[in-house]
Amino acid sequence: MDLKEISKQTEEVIEELLDIANLKPGSLFVLGGSTSEILGKKVGTAGSLDVAKAVVDPILEAIHKRGLYLAVQGCEHINRALLVEEEAKDKYGLEEVNVIPHEHAGGSIQTYAYQQFKNPVMVENLKGLGHAGLDIGLVLIGMHLRPVVVPVRLSRNKIGEATIVAARTRPKMVGGERARYKKL
């Protein structure tokens, strides 16, 4: 698999998703992914830090450009704990846990991202506070998003060989048939 192509596909996907999601600075963006799936293998069987770099670098660039916080989900071996910047942990009141991700407990994407963060901390969960997210390889990130999740259909549905699912969230609409709502 060509790493430049993976990076290009990731850049296209993240830019399109962030344009559609229209997040405010300081919002939490959730990333979950499997480099094994990107390579066409079963999740957890062919991790690659090189593939992780090709995915994480363009995502971090897009996230930083918009003033967002990135939360990177780990694998089931660390109970799907997430990597965030310490500033995001403090802002959102998240519970820190003690684990350092590596390729076989956390996964390649989280491991590479951990090395790139300025002040990385691991948190147990996001308390359902994520504003939008990207799932690369069907690793299931929905548990970290706010209650009203809106699927986002992108022009591309794969990165490498991995199926992707993108989502944004919106506030709950309350009040019934006589209520009026802001256009979202």
Curated annotation (Swiss-Prot):
Source organism, top-level taxon: Bacteria
Alphabetized Gene3D superfamilies for the sequence: Hypothetical protein TT1679 (3.40.50.10360)
Family: Belongs to the UPF0340 family.
Protein name according to UniProt: UPF0340 protein TTE0860
